[in-house]
A protein has these predicted regions:
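Flexible loop linkers connecting adjacent transmembrane helices
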Residues: 20-25, 60-64, 86-112, 133-150, ...
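C-terminal membrane-solvent junction of multi-pass transporters and transport-like membrane proteins
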Residues: 247-257, 466, 470, 476, ...
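Loop-to-transmembrane helix boundary motifs in multi-pass membrane proteins
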Residues: 152-154, 221-231, 415-422, 472-509, ...
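Juxtamembrane transmembrane-helix boundary signature
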Residues: 47, 74-103, 114-130, 459
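Hydrophobic alpha-helical segments and their helix-loop junctions in multi-pass secondary transporters
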Residues: 259-298, 303, 312-321, 536-549, ...
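Membrane-interface "cap" regions at the ends of multi-pass membrane proteins
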Residues: 2-57, 259, 334, 341-355, ...
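Hydrophobic transmembrane alpha-helices that form the core helical bundles
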Residues: 95, 110-156, 202-217, 229-233, ...
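Membrane-water interface regions at transmembrane-helix termini and the short interhelical loops
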Residues: 215, 234-257, 268-275, 502-517, ...
């Protein structure tokens, strides 16, 4: 049996070990003994819950619906990349008890406000709240089906519109645009093309037909979904505010919901997934470098969203350091937890972290902690994400595509926004000859989707508030005893909720302002891809240059982090330039 490590007075850690730079020095304490990895399960389940609601349920089934498995290799690569990133985030917290962002702020005080902006702006878009509310509305009220307009520039209309097309086709002379409204049958597409042989008219028709094909010409809207979303945001706020120990509540809720999701997904998978879908997925995983066809209708932002949200994405990954600290990983045991000022006994929370003397005993404990953290994260995060991604993408492929890999007849009508989820639910229902059984499984699919999006909504609000409170307390209000970390957390939580409600209210009341969940998710994904590139570089420097050599990043993980920075940086810049900026300009009349 190993001997207990010797006790040390709470002395300051010298700069020769870990430079304190812009914050007070760390203090010495012994590294606690590491438990078995199964006792550490929790933080990575929360992180996986954050991933389930966007990448697993929305983006990758959407990409699969649009283009099959041609891009699925990037899905597997994205999850693996985030696995390595998350463990580098955990490394600093295990060794110091501080969040990774506090480590960044030791490098420069300016990183405090930069990280605060990067933690608030990408996550304020309420895509998960609107997504969950849309599914809940569909479950209760059905879809509000509306025709969509597709238009293209046309200088003049030189032929008359035949009677059979007049209800859907018109020419706007003032705007000089040819406009088609609603769905389009193959016969109508041929009739439209044969109207006029002029090249400009043919170009306009080709543009319109392509746009109708991408969306189906219909929008499956949801009744009252903005107001339902506001109610869910308020519900999450109340649940978190009244939790005696916030982390315990989040872990319990996420574990229950993730378990429920897995049971439903596996059940649906057994009943629905076709063998040809499995073979197509395996082929796609080895199709390294394959990209969706140009006519698939997939925007660059959707691809980036799928990559960023193959895991949790953005600063949510940084929230892993806050989760493991509250769970008591490593030196986080000495920090304290966030408790409710209303229902819990407020715990003292250390302003700065701790480190350990590098004695043989403490180094043995460090190796035990690092091994246990890696195993826990592999099973709780990596495998959870991979299995759920595969199941939900396979379900999408089996419902929408045939053995030849092509969309089944009529499936184009679900191409707009979140409509493909409405399509999935109704196709699930059609798999069963008994109407009662089919309706039950349709409802089960919606319940799974609501649970997936709600887990993400809960996790995003909690993690964003944790990270922001940590930044402000450590860097701005460290000497202010009135503003404890717990009080800051709850104030920021409700500010986030109010901002999200304001965006939803604008979507409900302001003409032209879109509340489409997929648009919100794309904006968040594009921003978070760039955020991951930036903090990836900071993690590299922190764990390579600031961390003591015996605890620092290894060569293999160094290569993985360099790859992650380049990967997310490239795709983010492209998405922002090509799609985010034009979308924002159109919203605000630019």
């Amino acid at each position: 049996m190993s001997q207990p490590a010797p006790e040390f007075a709470e002395e300051l850690v010298p700069d020769s070990v870990i430079p304190h730079q812009t914050l007070p020095p760390l203090r010495y304490r012994d590294l606690p003994e590491a438990p078995h990895w199964r006792k550490l399960v929790g933080p990575s389940i929360i992180l996986a819950g954050l991933a389930l609601g966007s990448g697993e349920f929305v983006f990758w089934p959407y990409v699969t619906y649009k283009s099959g498995f041609v891009f699925f290799w990037a899905c597997m690569l994205g999850v693996l990349t985030q696995f390595f990133m998350n463990l580098e985030i955990e490394r600093w917290t295990l060794a110091t008890g501080e969040s990774a962002i506090t480590g960044f702020c030791r490098l420069s005080r300016h990183w405090a406000w930069v990280m605060l902006i990067m933690n608030v702006v990408p996550w304020v878009w309420p895509g998960w709240a609107t997504g969950a509310s849309m599914l809940l509305s569909w479950t209760m009220f059905g879809a509000d089906i509306k025709p969509l307009e597709a238009s293209a520039p046309l200088t003049q209309m030189t032929v008359s519109i035949p009677a059979e097309l007049q209800t859907q086709l018109r020419f706007d002379g003032s705007e000089k645009r040819l406009i088609w409204k609603g769905a389009q049958t193959p016969e109508q597409a041929v009739a439209l093309k044969n109207l006029d042989a002029e090249p400009e008219f043919q170009q306009a028709v080709a543009t319109i037909t392509a746009r109708v094909r991408r969306t189906g010409g219909l929008k499956h809207d949801a009744w009252y979904f903005q107001w339902i979303a506001i109610a869910t945001l308020l519900l999450v706020g109340v649940v978190l505010t009244t939790s005696p120990v916030v982390y315990n509540t989040v872990e319990a809720l996420q574990s229950y919901l993730v378990g429920l999701i897995f049971v439903i997904a596996i059940t649906l998978g057994i009943l629905i997934i076709k063998p040809y879908a499995v073979w197509a997925m395996l082929a796609g995983m080895w199709n390294i470098g394959g990209l969706p066809a140009a006519d698939s209708g997939l925007e660059f932002m959707a691809l980036l969203g799928a990559l960023a949200f193959a895991g949790a994405g953005g600063t949510m990954n940084l929230g892993q350091s806050n989760f493991i600290r509250d769970k008591g990983y490593g030196m986080g045991k000495y920090i304290g937890r966030i408790t409710s000022p209303l229902t819990g006994n407020e715990e003292p929370i250390a302003d700065v972290g701790f480190h350990f003397h590098h004695t043989p005993e403490n180094m043995r404990r460090w190796r035990d902690w690092w091994r246990a953290a890696n195993i826990e994260h592999f099973f709780s995060f990596y495998l959870t994400c991979v299995v759920s991604l595969m199941l939900l993408a396979l379900i999408s492929y089996s419902l929408f595509r045939g053995p030849d890999g092509q969309l089944l007849p009529g499936m184009e009508r679900f191409g707009g926004g979140m409509d493909f989820i409405w399509g999935e639910a109704n196709l699930v229902q059609s798999q069963f000859s008994n109407p009662l059984v089919g309706n039950a499984f349709r409802s089960l699919f919606f319940v799974m989707g609501i649970a997936l999006l709600f887990t993400t909504e809960l996790g995003v609000l909690d993690a964003a508030a944790r990270i922001s409170a940590d930044i402000i307390k450590i860097n701005v209000l460290r000497e202010n005893p009135q503003w404890t970390l717990a009080r800051l957390y709850f104030v920021i939580l409700w500010i986030e909720i109010i901002l999200s409600i304001a965006i939803l209210a604008a979507g409900a009341l302001v003409p032209g302002f879109s509340s489409e969940p997929l648009n919100f998710l794309k904006i968040s994904a594009a921003m978070n891809g760039m955020v991951m590139c930036i903090y990836g570089m900071l993690l590299l420097y922190l764990n390579l240059k600031i961390m003591p050599r015996s605890l620092a990043i290894t060569p293999l993980r160094f290569v993985a982090m360099v790859w992650a920075c380049a990967f997310f940086g490239y795709f983010s810049l492209q998405a922002i330039q090509l799609e985010v900026w034009p979308m924002l300009k159109s919203w605000f009349g630019g």
